[in-house]
């Protein structure tokens, strides 16, 4: 028999996928942004929804410099996990009169929801994952995260069963959030203990 050896060298197989990756990025950039208004009752319903998806909730505003600074990382996370049942749900604390400003910011960030994400949203009776919250900060905290103290940005990673896996006020550490998401989704895709 011939011994089995490890292949060594540089893998270039991904080079041939560059045109496909460019198409995917172009589709993301062209995805329309829809912003809906959401009150406390709607947020409570969204938060309590039974789903098979991990959700990253982000409370933010266009007038909040740390929120603006971290947003590209949130978009990156959303794209990274688009095919893995992970949703980015944004909750803007801007005034309702600034809805167009919110939509313009999200469009500039290329934060449109993918077809896969829109399909999941439509299954729950929503048209988007981007919301302008119309209630008070206290109502938002009561509906989303009773431990939220008030400052933004405020980010949660929530398991499909509703358990909060990650809670952070301030600018997120992208790799930390990615690690939390991977720990959760790998429970379903990884090898079973003892095997």
What spans do the regions from the language model cover?
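Residue-level recognition of beta-strand->loop/alpha-helix junctions
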Residues: 92-94, 132, 168
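N-terminal targeting signals for export/organelle localization
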Residues: 1-37, 166, 195
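Conserved redox-active cysteine motifs that mediate thiol-disulfide chemistry
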Residues: 59-76
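A short beta-strand-turn-helix
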Residues: 34-55, 78-81
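Short pre-active-site segment immediately N-terminal to redox-active cysteine/selenocysteine motifs
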Residues: 53-55, 59-63, 95, 151
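Short, internal strand/loop/helix patches
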Residues: 106-152
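Loop/turn elements at helix/coil->beta-strand transitions in domains of secreted/extracellular proteins
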Residues: 50-55, 84-87, 113, 125-128, ...
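Thiol-/selenol-based redox modules, centered on thioredoxin-like
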Residues: 9, 150-195
């Amino acid at each position: 028999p011939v011994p089995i050896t490890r292949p060594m060298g540089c893998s270039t197989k991904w080079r041939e996928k560059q045109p496909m990756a460019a198409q995917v990025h172009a589709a993301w950039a062209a995805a329309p942004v829809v912003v809906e208004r959401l009150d406390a009752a709607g947020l409570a319903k969204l938060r309590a929804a039974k789903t098979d998806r991990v959700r990253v909730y982000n409370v933010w505003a266009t007038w909040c410099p740390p929120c603006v600074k971290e947003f590209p990382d949130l978009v990156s996370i959303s794209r990274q996990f688009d095919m893995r049942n992970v949703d980015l749900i944004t909750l803007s604390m801007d005034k309702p009169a600034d809805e167009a400003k919110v939509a313009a910011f999200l469009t500039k960030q290329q934060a449109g929801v993918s077809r896969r994400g829109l399909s999941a949203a439509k299954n729950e009776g929503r048209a988007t994952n981007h919301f302008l919250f119309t209630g008070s900060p206290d109502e938002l905290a009561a509906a989303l995260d009773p431990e939220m103290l008030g400052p933004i940005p405020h980010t949660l990673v929530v398991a499909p069963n509703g358990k909060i896996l990650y809670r952070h006020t301030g600018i997120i550490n992208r790799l930390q959030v990615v690690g939390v998401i991977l720990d959760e989704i790998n429970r379903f895709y990884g090898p079973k203990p003892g095997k």
